[in-house]
């Protein structure tokens, strides 16, 4: 089997992991219910022992591990980036707080693999801003608030 085919199989296996029931629950929570206001709030959640702490850590560590595989050549970068975009959503939500989290926990490299991978994406700042807008919309929808139609320009 050639390298591209092997990489494709790894990407499919990574996708299957995302479909595990608990991971699906964690991902849904992260996208629609997790609305951090500060890095300190995220650190407090991580240390809380609450169910949501496990959800956060599952999502963050999944994407950090996956990004490490890509960054270190375990999976073809172009193939991965063309097949995935959820890592952009995760990073878009966490990016405003990354520096504060790193300072608070004393780990300068917290989520560094994810950050490095995301920052390689062409037009990344525009894409991250778009993801943040979508996240706000999805969060409002999960709370039952009125939402603007995606793509309405409002």
Q: Would you name each region that the model predicts?
A:
Residues 1-153:
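Acidic, Ser/Pro/Thr-rich low-complexity regulatory regions
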């Amino acid at each position: 089997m050639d390298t591209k085919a092997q990489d494709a199989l790894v990407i499919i296996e990574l996708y299957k992991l995302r479909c595990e029931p608990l991971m699906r629950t964690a991902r849904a929570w992260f996208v629609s219910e997790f609305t951090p206001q500060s890095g300190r709030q995220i650190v407090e959640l991580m240390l809380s022992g609450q169910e949501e702490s496990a959800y956060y850590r599952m999502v963050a560590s999944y994407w950090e591990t996956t990004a490490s595989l890509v960054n270190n050549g375990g999976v073809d970068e172009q193939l991965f980036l063309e097949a995935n975009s959820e890592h952009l959503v995760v990073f878009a939500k966490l990016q405003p707080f990354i520096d504060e989290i790193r300072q608070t926990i004393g780990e300068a490299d917290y989520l560094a693999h994810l950050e490095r991978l995301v920052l390689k994406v062409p037009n990344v700042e525009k894409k991250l801003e778009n993801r943040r807008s979508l996240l706000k919309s999805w969060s409002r929808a999960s709370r039952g608030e009125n939402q603007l139609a995606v793509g309405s320009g409002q």
